[in-house]
Amino acid sequence: MSVNDWAFLVLIGVILALLLIPTGEFMFRVYTGKKTFLSPLFVPVEAWILKACGAGSDEEMDWKSFAVAMMIFSVIGIVFVFILQEVQQFLPLNPLGATAVPWDLSLNTAVSFATNTNWQFYVPETTVSYLTQMIGLTVQNFMSAAVGMVVLVAFIYGFSRRSSHTIGNFWVLLLRSIWILLPLSFVIALVLVSQGAPQTLSGPVTVPLLNATNDSGGNIITTQLISLGPAASQIAVKMLGTNGGGFFNANSAHPFENPTWFTDLVEIVAILLIPVSLCFMFGKMIGSVKKGIAILIAMMILFVPLLGLGIWSEIGGNPAFTPLGISQAPSHLQSGGNMEGKEVRFGPVQSAAFSVITTVTSCGAVNSMHDSFMPLGGLVQIFDIQLGEIVFGGVGSGLYCMLVFVIIAMFIAGLMVGRTPELYGKKIEPYEMKLSTIHILIPIFLILIGTAIAVSITAGTSMTANPGPHGFSEILYAFSSVSQNNGSAFAGLSSDTFYNLTTAFCMFVGRYAIAIITLALAGAFVAKKIVPPGEGTLQDHRPLFIIWVVFTILIIGALSFLPALSLGPVVEFLIQMGRGVIHV
């Protein structure tokens, strides 16, 4: 690794450390109704919207009403995006004349963006119009992220309130989430535009090629069509809301989505900003910042080794080139390492770092092709996702999924010392433990059963670009990604009706079943009294607590997915080590 690579990684950490507290404090003040510098603008608008909708800011909901409101809102979003894709040929802002999207692909896309997954089985430049991108997909980038944040705040109320039966008002919290996302997205979009990302309603432009070329039919090609569009506004919230769906097919590897090293830095910071700041906000809301920081430290302990392994796997290069005498060492002429599927403006270190960050969160954006990573690099990406998107995770969803693991860890710890388990002053009883267990098992079942079905039928195996262990990895990655609402992919997997429908089902269940169970947990905890810690209570901010949570997460992750990983990336790695080249 060069000095520039180290400086890039350190700069990410420094910027996040500087922004963590002010961003967390801002979110805390927004959700608790305290005054912020944006209150003069947003408070009157919020009051007007709530009045127009017949909702009051002081009207609270129990967890069931909250869940119903969430599902109604989300299903309306799915239906709207589905219909929009089917009628886009009749609507304006369609310079390339995009036609109606096939119904199964349209359903997959609608569910994908509403669930914050942003799995893309289509080419955005040619499949959807500017209007569909703007009022359909970009709007859902805001709304799906806001829903995740809303569920988290309701879950936090479960711990911070006592002897109650309400967990907030869905509509009020939804609006306040938008007040957080909107100004931050605006700033990020301006930065992207300043660096060269397009934000225009003009159609594509035709430019002459520097060197003429021939197409597959032997015809001489002298010009190229370059797609444009209102990209910067969608890219900003795609990153900030950990959505990940690209305006262009190459996603953040495209020079219009991610033009420079500086935009790469901005996009990485945008991905991590809200997830890490939510830990601080969580601590503030339950009355102890150090408890939120303890959760953040646990996430960091899991993250740093994964980041290191991901980078190490790529800077070493591809052993298949060694017998050919091809140098993969870094020099003033090349970045070195495994450069297949990577942009030269980023190199292997920035590409690997981006891939780890986008898979530990639920973002799913890519600045390189994950399918071209070394087996260990691919293993890290898949394992990141399979951990449950809890290492930072998606905005809102990452922290509430992490807290479910904390519940299980504290339950086990309580049983080991022979006392009633408790967390943040709330007792953990069989009902909460059953819900937490189901919460963790649902994505595990979706991933493993979905993969098993796909590898057992022709409709599943015929869509992989590679046979053997890498083909299995492509399928395993796909079902891991959609079930955990990540959205990235090993791009060697193509779409058909089977994958469009099965992945849509996994996305829907993986998002909303988990969210509903989280709300049920919030409803159970909010009704409990807060009990003072006693002798033998595991302090929920001490190093022992952090280590125990990390240990619990790793045990559950290893036991759940090690057999499946052994059939894919682990086998690839062993073949690579044994022969120096991968044969598939």
Swiss-Prot record:
The chain crosses the membrane at residues 8-28, 65-85, 139-159, 172-192, 262-282, 292-312, 398-418, 440-460, 507-527, 544-564. GO terms for molecular function: P-type potassium transmembrane transporter activity; potassium ion binding. One of its GO terms (cellular component) is plasma membrane. It is a multi-pass membrane protein. It is found in: Cell membrane. Keywords: Cell membrane, Ion transport, Membrane, Potassium, Potassium transport, Transmembrane, Transmembrane helix, Transport. It comes from the Archaea. The system is composed of three essential subunits: KdpA, KdpB and KdpC. Part of the high-affinity ATP-driven potassium transport (or Kdp) system, which catalyzes the hydrolysis of ATP coupled with the electrogenic transport of potassium into the cytoplasm. This subunit binds the extracellular potassium ions and delivers the ions to the membrane domain of KdpB through an intramembrane tunnel. Belongs to the KdpA family. HAMAP family: KdpA. This is Potassium-transporting ATPase potassium-binding subunit. It comes from Methanoregula boonei (strain DSM 21154 / JCM 14090 / 6A8). The gene is kdpA.
